């Protein structure tokens, strides 16, 4: 059996598995339950808090297939041409899902021209398109974009919550931690 890093092995697979972001997962669950899902979301918070994982789970809960899920690294695809290509793609119908779901990771890295090219699509998206913009630097996302999104701020989980998670993972992996090690790891993890 190949070794798998712990962050991959214990990545949340459902909203229930997400720790410390109940304000986000609860709101998204309610939207799904009410059938009132928006077209644009902005997930903001420091690295390692689960923004991309929650976006993937959100897509999964909306029954979006892999063929209709687009993950775009905006740090390396941040040009006007990249966004124009996305704008063209968004207007084609989904393959078999109710939605085409776009995750733009590191969205704050888009160029000014790219933001301008994206704004029209964000203002008047097709009914089958959902966008999740994930950022570690909310202040770099233009106000005109923020105002068109539902903004969710991801918070660092409590040290106590992280300590419990560390204990559970250690137990699952067959390790016994020396007293205080779980708290030290939680402190050094700084919320992620």
Segments predicted by a language model, with ranges:
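Short glycine/serine/threonine/alanine-rich loop segments
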Residues: 175
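P-loop/Walker A NTP-binding region and its immediately flanking N-terminal helices
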Residues: 1-151, 160-161, 169, 179
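A Lys-centered signature of the CheY-like receiver
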Residues: 155
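A short helix-loop-helix "switch/interaction" segment in the helical subdomain of ASCE P-loop NTPases
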Residues: 171, 180-191
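Short loop-to-helix capping motifs
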Residues: 21, 191-192
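Aromatic/hydrophobic pocket-lining residues that form π-stacking "cages" and hydrophobic walls in ligand
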Residues: 55, 166, 185
């Amino acid at each position: 059996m190949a070794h798998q890093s712990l962050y991959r092995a214990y990545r949340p697979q459902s909203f229930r598995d997400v720790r410390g972001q109940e304000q986000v997962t609860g709101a998204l669950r309610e939207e799904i339950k009410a059938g009132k899902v928006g077209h644009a979301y902005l997930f903001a918070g420091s690295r390692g808090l689960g923004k991309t994982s929650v976006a993937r789970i959100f897509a999964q809960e909306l029954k979006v297939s892999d063929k209709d899920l687009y993950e775009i690294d905006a740090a390396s695809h941040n040009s006007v041409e990249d966004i124009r290509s996305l704008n063209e793609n968004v207007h084609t119908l989904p393959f078999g899902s109710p939605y085409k779901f776009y995750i733009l990771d590191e969205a704050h890295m888009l160029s000014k021209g790219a933001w301008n090219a994206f704004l029209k699509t964000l203002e008047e998206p097709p009914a089958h398109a959902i966008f999740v913009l994930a950022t570690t630097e909310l202040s770099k996302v233009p106000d005109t974009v923020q105002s068109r999104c539902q903004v969710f701020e991801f918070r660092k989980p409590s040290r106590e919550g992280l300590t419990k998670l560390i204990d559970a993972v250690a137990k699952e992996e067959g390790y016994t931690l020396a007293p205080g090690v779980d708290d030290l790891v939680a402190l050094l993890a700084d919320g992620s």
